[in-house]
From Swiss-Prot:
Residues annotated as binding [4Fe-4S] cluster: 12, 96, 197
UniProt cofactor(s): [4Fe-4S] cluster
GO BP of this protein: dimethylallyl diphosphate biosynthetic process; isopentenyl diphosphate biosynthetic process, methylerythritol 4-phosphate pathway; terpenoid biosynthetic process
Biological role: Catalyzes the conversion of 1-hydroxy-2-methyl-2-(E)-butenyl 4-diphosphate (HMBPP) into a mixture of isopentenyl diphosphate (IPP) and dimethylallyl diphosphate (DMAPP). Acts in the terminal step of the DOXP/MEP pathway for isoprenoid precursor biosynthesis.
Binding-site residues for dimethylallyl diphosphate, renumbered to this chain: 41, 74, 124, 225-227, 269
Active-site feature positions: 126
Annotated pathway: Isoprenoid biosynthesis; dimethylallyl diphosphate biosynthesis; dimethylallyl diphosphate from (2E)-4-hydroxy-3-methylbutenyl diphosphate: step 1/1; Isoprenoid biosynthesis; isopentenyl diphosphate biosynthesis via DXP pathway; isopentenyl diphosphate from 1-deoxy-D-xylulose 5-phosphate: step 6/6
Tree of life domain: Bacteria
Family affiliation: Belongs to the IspH family.
Phylogenetic placement of the source organism: Bacteria, Pseudomonadati, Pseudomonadota, Gammaproteobacteria, Enterobacterales
Protein known as: 4-hydroxy-3-methylbut-2-enyl diphosphate reductase
Amino acid sequence: MNIILTNPRGFCAGVKRAILIVENALKVYKKTIYIRHELVHNQYVINTLRQKGVVFVEKIEQIPDYSVVIFSAHGVSKKVVQEAVKKKLIILDATCPLVEKVHIEVSKSSEKAIETILIGHRGHPEVEGTIGQYNNKNGKIYLVESIEDVHNLSVQNSKKLNFFTQTTLSITNTKKIIAALKNKFPEISGPNKEDICYATTNRQIAVRQLSKIADIIFVIGSNNSSNSNRLAELGKETGTFTKLISSFLDIKKKWLKNVNYIGITAGASAPEILVTEVIQYLRKIGAHKPIEMIGVREKKIFKIPKKLLNIKTILDENG
């Protein structure tokens, strides 16, 4: 059996930044660090942070006054921020800058009372945070998940309408939904390029290339990871047998019967150690040394926000 690794795979710049913020906060603050929701959707990462003393909560009311709170990489609504301020919490925002970019645009639409359509998955924390940027009672924000939703959608003023997207969607499906929106609402405005992030795009392109070679594809990521699920869906759409696994423990040997090429990728919130463990397991049962595919080299780095520079400065001074 041959192992083929996609490039790029695993952590994106937004996830790396979020984890760095938490690790820095743990070194600087001599009190419990609370994180609202899972920092990123990967159980290995969450368990690792828990072992370091981090406490995860779903509601701000669960956090004692004057504590340190970190908002997850998915972002939060304006209401959540207000709740944190009311409790006089020390706020560290780990929202991905690409998600924050969408927040800013939705806020602008809200300020102008321009009706707004968000393409995304209902219940996902990023979607809830983005919808929560729109608070103008004279306007409205709508969520669509499919072309059918577009067909059933009614707005108050189709001549003054904006759309935005969740950052971790399927490229192909999103383009179809946008086309349906533009067909139904010819005067709708949106970003020149959909808001799907570079990392999501790069990983989906890599999986499509991988599917031309692999007999089976393992997507390493947690079940609640949107971008990991999209990678698994894409693999299946190409006709390649594809499985979303959280670790090597999920692999069943029967899947590998008569398999020559095993493809491996990892969602943007999955650490490389999980990839390494999968490779080690496959090597033990007879697979050859992995081959790396040539792919896009991601150079993007998201800096820590100015309000957190004091953390970095303290760390630098302490060596």
